[in-house]
Structures are given as structure tokens and as C-alpha cells.
């Protein structure tokens, strides 16, 4: 019976990692191009007929950007994830065939054919490795990319494009039906727990963004851009901890409120929920009520808001659409706060041990980080050697490589500067894009396996909260010796 239980746990853990890996791959195609999406969203919000500054001439930018530029960028990034720049070029060529072969924006198509283009050229290069006559390398490399890219573009135009266009239209119809039937708020039952498992970027950019862009074509805005980006439920959790929490959780919550609500880094509140899993009820309740408010008030954004900051959300709101958006965010925050407050106050009265366990978890983070830096990989044999010669690159990695990891990078850079330690580069990356030459990698606990796969020779330091300075203090003590 014990063996069965263990194998089941391993199976669940493996499935979770696979889902996270797939989600990370999807978001990895979109996140580096978020600036382009924001540019398109701003131009749309400003210059279309119903925009803030209607301009028939400048509004001509809207359609080419959404039909050509954005899908091409996704296709290029998808190919690049599989096989660097060469894969990106073939992925972009293949995506172009799909764009021309369909009358709707091919975001889903770019996510499919871009990585496929990268995969095809990668396999081709491997097949002809060490078989090219000396002096013909450039000729073969250039023509192979051109020929394979052209072939994939034709296949995409003739066969794949129409199929994906049909699938995209079908998904759009399903999304519209769900909205019309009033079932959209129930999506929070899936979305909010999935966010806590670090699938937030995959959900937002892999699922909701394509659906949202499809809806924008018809309605000029979409509620799908708000479902994951809404900071309300997380804000309620942090406010409840600020008033009714204890110890380090209470002390750190007010600072986390600013980072979450204004900075848009939602990962900051995940550890607070993980400390008390019952708080999932609070974020789910807040999410349902917020989504219901969005639907009733016909709220929506013109493009994806990333990061999920209230500033970005308001910037992506259509003209006259700010109040419905703010109302939904406020309702989500209030409901989440009320439910979380009841849970926190109830747990204090009924069992102090529960909260003490949560505090012990926070203390364990410090011990764990100290042990992790010495035990995760046996490369850390002599701390003095690491300072003088071994550590050249420290990487902070999160799912998307743009939010919480950047905060950790900033904190450690200051620690190194204060300690007068030079010559160590500190950078942040997506967990699936960690450079092989990384010496030390700081990563969230449930992404550690993906980090080891990306950088097998690095020392992995697991961390629950990138704002927890105790981890960095322990690390600094070791490299100062």
C-alpha cells in the first residue's frame, strides 16, 4: 500500500512538472514580446474611432500589427526556444504562410508552427552534422533554412492555416457562448489555484490572450484579459495578512501589497496562500465575485495587461472603461479580504499551532537555503574559492523570467555591492532559458527540477519567496568567508 501511495505521489509530481513545463513554454513565446502587445494595445486604445484620440491615419497601424507583426514575433520566439536564432528564422517563415492563409490573427498558429519550424531545422542540422564538405558550410546552412522555411510556409498556407483558423474560430465561439451563458465567473475555480502552482503566465498568455484578441476584433475589448491579470484577490490576501497575520508574514505583507498591486508581480502573494492552503477559498471567492462584476458591468481591456499591475490594467482599458474595471478589482479584493480575514482569525483562535507551523516553514526557508547552497551540488567545497574564481554568473529564475526573479536579482546585487564583491554577474531568466554556464541558480521550490534540467552543473538554491532576505543573508555569509 505504501508503494502505491509513493508511486501515485511521484506520478502527480511528474504530471505537475510536465504541465508547468508546457505552460512555461507557451508563456515563453509570449512574454518576451509583451512590449509589442502593449504597443499595439496603446495604439488601439488611442487612435481607433472609439479611442481617446481618434485618428484615421494612425489607426491604420492597428490591423497590420495584429495580423502580421504579433503572430510573426510569436512564431519567431517559438522557433528560437527550440533552436536559437536559426530555429526562430525558420519558425517566422513558416508562420508567414499561416498568416496569409487565414483571415484572422494567427496567434495560435504561431504557437504551433513556430516551434515546429525550429524543431525541423534542428533535426536537419543534426542529421547532416559532420557531413558537409569543408568550405560549403555557409551555403548549406543558408539554403537549408531557406528551403525548409519555404516548404513549411507553403504547407502552412495550404493545409495547416485553414485548420488552425477553424480551431481558433471555434474556440472564440465557445468563449463567447460561455460569456453569454454567464458561466465565465466559474473559471476562477480553476484559474486561482492554477496561479498558485505558477501556471499564471501559461494561462494568461497561452489561453486567455488568444481568446481575448479574437474577441477584441468583434467587440473592441475583452474580459478575458482581466481573468488572470486581476490583482484584486491577491490584494485581499495580503491586506488580511497585514491586519490579522503574525510574525514575518504580517511584517512583510504591507511591502508585498505595493509590489503586487502597483508592480503587478502576483507571485509575491503565492507563498502566503501556500502557508495556509485554506486561503485558496478566499482567492477563489474573490475571483468569482470579481469576474461576475466584470461580466455584469461589461468590463474589458483592449490588450493583455502584463504585468498584472493596476497601472497596466488601467492603461489597457478602453475609453470610458476604467470604472467597470476598478469596480471588479475592488469587489475581488473586498471578498478575498473578508474570507481570508475569517480564516486567519479563526485559525488564531482555534489553533495557534497552525500559524506556528507556517512560521516554522518560513524559518525552514533560512535553514534550507543555507543547506541548499552547500548540499544541492557538491561543487561548493570551499567558499573562499567560489568568491575568487568559481562564481562568475548567478541566475535568478522564475516561470517567465521577468517578474519575481528580477526582484531577487536586484536584492542580491545590492548585497554583493555592500559586501564589495565584484566580478560576479547577477541576471534573471526564465527557468527554461537558464544559461548553461550559470554557477548558482536561485529558483522557487516547485520549479527546481526544471532549473536542474536547464543548468545541470549549477548549484541550485531553492527559495519560497524572492523577497525573503534571510536566504540571501545566508548565501552572503558563505561567500564572504
Curated annotation (Swiss-Prot):
Homodimer. GO terms for biological process: phosphoenolpyruvate-dependent sugar phosphotransferase system. One of its GO terms (molecular function) is protein-N(PI)-phosphohistidine-mannitol phosphotransferase system transmembrane transporter activity. Residues 22-357 form the PTS EIIC type-2 domain. This is PTS system mannitol-specific EIICB component. Its EC number is 2.7.1.197. It is found in: Cell membrane. It comes from the Bacteria. It comes from Clostridium acetobutylicum (strain ATCC 824 / DSM 792 / JCM 1419 / IAM 19013 / LMG 5710 / NBRC 13948 / NRRL B-527 / VKM B-1787 / 2291 / W). The lineage of its organism: Bacteria, Bacillati, Bacillota, Clostridia, Eubacteriales. Gene3D superfamilies: 3.40.50.2300.
Amino acid at each position: 500500500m505504501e508503494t502505491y501511495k509513493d508511486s501515485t505521489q511521484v506520478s502527480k509530481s511528474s504530471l505537475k512538472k510536465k504541465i508547468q513545463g508546457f505552460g512555461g513554454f507557451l508563456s515563453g513565446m509570449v512574454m518576451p514580446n509583451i512590449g509589442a502587445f502593449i504597443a499595439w494595445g496603446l495604439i488601439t486604445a488611442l487612435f481607433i474611432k472609439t479611442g481617446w484620440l481618434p485618428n484615421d491615419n494612425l489607426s491604420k497601424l492597428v490591423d497590420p500589427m495584429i495580423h502580421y507583426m504579433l503572430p510573426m514575433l510569436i512564431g519567431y520566439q517559438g522557433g528560437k526556444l527550440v533552436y536559437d536564432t536559426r530555429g526562430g528564422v525558420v519558425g517566422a517563415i513558416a508562420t508567414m504562410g499561416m498568416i496569409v492563409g487565414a483571415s484572422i490573427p494567427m496567434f495560435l498558429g504561431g504557437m504551433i508552427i513556430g516551434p515546429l519550424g525550429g524543431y525541423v531545422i534542428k533535426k536537419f542540422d543534426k542529421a547532416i552534422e559532420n557531413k558537409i564538405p569543408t568550405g560549403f558550410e555557409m551555403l548549406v546552412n543558408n539554403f537549408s533554412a531557406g528551403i525548409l522555411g519555404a516548404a513549411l510556409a507553403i504547407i502552412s498556407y495550404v493545409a495547416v492555416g485553414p485548420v488552425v483558423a477553424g480551431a481558433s474560430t471555434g474556440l472564440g465561439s465557445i468563449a463567447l457562448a460561455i460569456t453569454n451563458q454567464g458561466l465565465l465567473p466559474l473559471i476562477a475555480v480553476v484559474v486561482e489555484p492554477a496561479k498558485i502552482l505558477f501556471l499564471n503566465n501559461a494561462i494568461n498568455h497561452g489561453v486567455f490572450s488568444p481568446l481575448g484578441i479574437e474577441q477584441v476584433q468583434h467587440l473592441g475589448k475583452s474580459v478575458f484579459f482581466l481573468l488572470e491579470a486581476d490583482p484584486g484577490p491577491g490584494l485581499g490576501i495580503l491586506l488580511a495578512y497585514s491586519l490579522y497575520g503574525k510574525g514575518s508574514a504580517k511584517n512583510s505583507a504591507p511591502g508585498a501589497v505595493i509590489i503586487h498591486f502597483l508592480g503587478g508581480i502576483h507571485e509575491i502573494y503565492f507563498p502566503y496562500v501556500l502557508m495556509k492552503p485554506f486561503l485558496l477559498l478566499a482567492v477563489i471567492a474573490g475571483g468569482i465575485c470579481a469576474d461576475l462584476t466584470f461580466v455584469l458591468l461589461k468590463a474589458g481591456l483592449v490588450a493583455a495587461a502584463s504585468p498584472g499591475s493596476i497601472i497596466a490594467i488601467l492603461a489597457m482599458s478602453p475609453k470610458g472603461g476604467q470604472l467597470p474595471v476598478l469596480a471588479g478589482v475592488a469587489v475581488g479584493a473586498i471578498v478575498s479580504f473578508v474570507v481570508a480575514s475569517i480564516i486567519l482569525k479563526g485559525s488564531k483562535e482555534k489553533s495557534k499551532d497552525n500559524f506556528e507551523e507556517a512560521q516554522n516553514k518560513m524559518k525552514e526557508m533560512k535553514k534550507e537555503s543555507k543547506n541548499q547552497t552547500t548540499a544541492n551540488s557538491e561543487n561548493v567545497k570551499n567558499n573562499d574559492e567560489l568568491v575568487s574564481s568559481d562564481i562568475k554568473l548567478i541566475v535568478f529564475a522564475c516561470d517567465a523570467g521577468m517578474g519575481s526573479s528580477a526582484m531577487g536579482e536586484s536584492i542580491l546585487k545590492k548585497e554583493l555591492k555592500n559586501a564589495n564583491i565584484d566580478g560576479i554577474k547577477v541576471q534573471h531568466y526564465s527557468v527554461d532559458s537558464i544559461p548553461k554556464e550559470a554557477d548558482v541558480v536561485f529558483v522557487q521550490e516547485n520549479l527546481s527540477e526544471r532549473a536542474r534540467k536547464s543548468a545541470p552543473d549549477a548549484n541550485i538554491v531553492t527559495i519560497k519567496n524572492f523577497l525573503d532576505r534571510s536566504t540571501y543573508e545566508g548565501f552572503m555569509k558563505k561567500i564572504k568567508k
